[in-house]
């Protein structure tokens, strides 16, 4: 049995064509089904529906053989024990620093002000600001990041940005681009040794699909 860990939403939808390229069709819609283990047209392949932030953990500890997760999640989680054979080039976005439109971020940084930054990407933010020599107090949030500057909780946020429409709707502007993000295929290294042929077949099919 090959077990693939996926999260609902954009990554799941953009993974379906890659699975089809590997001859795998998911037989149930995760948005409609309450099941957390989904069957496929391949009797030896199943899909686990987990939180995006939990995908690396399931793969690392053997709950799943493979998983698909964003580069952002891997950087926050750490990638010990995970083999990363492919950048799948799906679910593309970026991690950016954003502030209220009326906040002079450049002056605050230049003056050496200590900034309060709200984010769920604490590790990424800490490394980024440390490299720039900017002093920050990081506030860990799990959602609705755009709210933090609007109510005075923070001076800035570090968050995923896709179109930028949510920032604009909340009168925020991007002031720094930290990195581009896309989703990666991650593989449990022990599973790769024990189930090499079927896992390699999936990896090769994905690689062929993204090169077209």
Swiss-Prot record:
Enzyme class: transferase
Catalyzed chemical reaction(s): 1-(5-phospho-beta-D-ribosyl)-ATP + diphosphate = 5-phospho-alpha-D-ribose 1-diphosphate + ATP
Keyword entries, A-Z: Amino-acid biosynthesis, ATP-binding, Cytoplasm, Glycosyltransferase, Histidine biosynthesis, Nucleotide-binding, Transferase
Pathway field: Amino-acid biosynthesis; L-histidine biosynthesis; L-histidine from 5-phospho-alpha-D-ribose 1-diphosphate: step 1/9
A single cellular component GO annotation: cytoplasm
Entry-linked Gene3D superfamilies: Periplasmic binding protein-like II
E.C. no: 2.4.2.17
GO molecular function per UniProt: ATP binding; ATP phosphoribosyltransferase activity
Tagged with keyword Repeat: no
Biological process, per Gene Ontology: L-histidine biosynthetic process
Complex and partners: Heteromultimer composed of HisG and HisZ subunits.
NCBIfam families named in the record: hisG (TIGR00070)
HAMAP family in the cross-refs: HisG_Short
Protein name as catalogued: ATP phosphoribosyltransferase
Biological classification of the source: Bacteria, Pseudomonadati, Pseudomonadota, Betaproteobacteria, Burkholderiales
Gene: hisG
